[in-house]
Amino acid sequence: MNDRIYLTNDGYNRLKEELYVLVHQTRKEVLEKIAEARAHGDLSENAEYDAAREEQSQIEARIGDLESKLSAATILDPKQIKTDKVYILTSVKLRNLDNPDEIIEYTLVSSEEADTDAGKISVRSPVGRSLIGKTVGAKVTIVVPKGELHYEILEIFVKP
């Protein structure tokens, strides 16, 4: 993966912590499971061994993914984010034009930090892609699987 990914310092540290746990804890636990399953004898019909090897494969893939993301990461400083347009790490306040009483707020983040429950949406999501580069007052139509959403951007800001 040579695509640059943009993370907050917290997001970068979370990925680093996950990598540390996988490398120093989980990997060792799985190797112990494999050794234990091997001790049971015939590996050709050993479901325990097969399951442990599958788990090892998944862990090694995740380790590789995390290492790749961390090496391609650019840590963004929220203090340096402009608010003239919607960028990654900006928050936006939107008015639903189909229901003007509904005001929603999103913060645009990388896919790695997206958390819809916390109002953090990926810049690669349909909503994120529709908002990037827009300014206050812009009316946006967002195509989602259920149809179209119509919003007006009321405010662009950076959360502390």
Curated annotation (Swiss-Prot):
The processes (GO biological process) annotated in the record are: DNA-templated transcription elongation; regulation of DNA-templated transcription elongation
* GO MF assignments: DNA binding; RNA polymerase binding
- Which segments of the protein form a coiled coil according to its record? 45-74
- What keywords is this UniProt entry annotated with? Coiled coil, DNA-binding, Transcription, Transcription regulation
A Pfam match: GreA_GreB_N
Q: What's this chain's function?
A: Necessary for efficient RNA polymerase transcription elongation past template-encoded arresting sites. The arresting sites in DNA have the property of trapping a certain fraction of elongating RNA polymerases that pass through, resulting in locked ternary complexes. Cleavage of the nascent transcript by cleavage factors such as GreA or GreB allows the resumption of elongation from the new 3'terminus. GreA releases sequences of 2 to 3 nucleotides.
Q: Which family does it belong to?
A: Belongs to the GreA/GreB family.
Q: What is the name attached to this protein's record?
A: Transcription elongation factor GreA
Gene designation:
greA
